[in-house]
Amino acid sequence: MNDKQRWYTLSSTANTFNGANLNIVWDKENTYWSKLASTSSYPYPKLNDSKYCNELGNLNKLDICQDLYWSADGTSLVAINDDYGIRQYLIPESENCDNESMLVPFTRTFSPRSIIASALSPTYSLFNENRSGNMLLISGRDVPLQSYQLDTDSTSCSKPSMTYNTLNDKIERYDIIFSMIFINSSQFITGSVNNKISLYDVRRKEPVVSFDRFKREQSSSKRKSIISCFIDRANIDCNNRYPNIVYFGTYGREMGVVDKRMASQRRLLNFQHGNGVYQILPSFNGHFLYILHRSSNTIDIVDVRKDNKVINQLRIPYKIGTQKMKGTLSETNGLMLGTDYGSVINWQSDMIEFGGLASDGSIVKDYQQSVSECLTSFTGSRINIVQQCPQGNEYFAISYSPDKFSDSDKTSAVKSGISLLRASID
């Protein structure tokens, strides 16, 4: 690799989520919270308990962060965990790399059931005077889609603020929402089975429009007809470039596009590798889409200006398995993706903004020449989420864990958690 960069840990959950017993995790978290609350002049709201905290069985499992979000102002994080937990973290003010601080939940609440997918409003901040902008959407099985208001007290997420109709009249059951994303602060879009996509207004229970024309076009397909993801819209410039269209991926190895003006969707690509698209990252200039697949070691690069054709590929130095490894892309830092051995690989911005090509337009085939590596202190763990702070190019939040689908990794010795890191060139 061209160069190696050291990322320094500023704050982390330390050993809170280590091991494979949820009761032990919750007890450690309560202890850390009590120590923090007793030494702080600020009245920290009491952490809520899971309704399963008194159960003796079925709690021997990993507690991995499945979704991680920055607030718009970069002052807090929201984490969705496998223990059905919804946690808000305030970012510590100290930036001393030699004195790592403890990342303790500011609020902790629990969904009564497992969370399949989530989406956070782009206007979220713990410091919002108007809490209506702090909307979190969560989906589950056999329940309608629900939204919650994230607040600064122990009542945060105690009950839904809105319930949205996802009932499938044909089978008299609720559609399972596998993916969703806010288009803006007042609209969001959802994806479910049979390649069904629905557009909602946050203030209305019924969808503005639902359509599955894509499903009928592909009715002969034997692969899973599930909308697996939508284009990552954390990039503000991307929102300006795509105000009315939304790209999406499926577990059937396809990519398509929705045009909310015409209430239509169409298939653009059918990939020949991997086991389903799970993330679509746009370049900052809006010209390219970076497509990540399960069970693959390749990132496809799609040029939206050339009939949405794959014009290049980036090779990953390991094979992504069933557990998703979510990356981040920015104008300053390019494309960053965690590895299964505790580092972060980085394709520089000047290459990413030109479709992964060299300055002379040629395709760089040698992996060693096209990527650098960022070293962390989490050697041996999988860094399954990398999120850049929206207010600081050198700050990152990550989730690290063992392989959740490997039985050998479900022991008391495994390490999981969330960490706040700062990049610095050696």
From Swiss-Prot:
Keywords: mRNA processing, mRNA splicing, Nucleus. It is found in: Nucleus. GO terms for cellular component: nucleus. One of its GO terms (biological process) is mRNA processing. PANTHER family: TELOMERASE CAJAL BODY PROTEIN 1. Belongs to the SWT21 family. Associates with snRNPs. Involved in mRNA splicing. Helps to stabilize the U1 snRNP-5' splice site interaction. This is Protein SWT21. It comes from Vanderwaltozyma polyspora (strain ATCC 22028 / DSM 70294 / BCRC 21397 / CBS 2163 / NBRC 10782 / NRRL Y-8283 / UCD 57-17). The gene is SWT21.
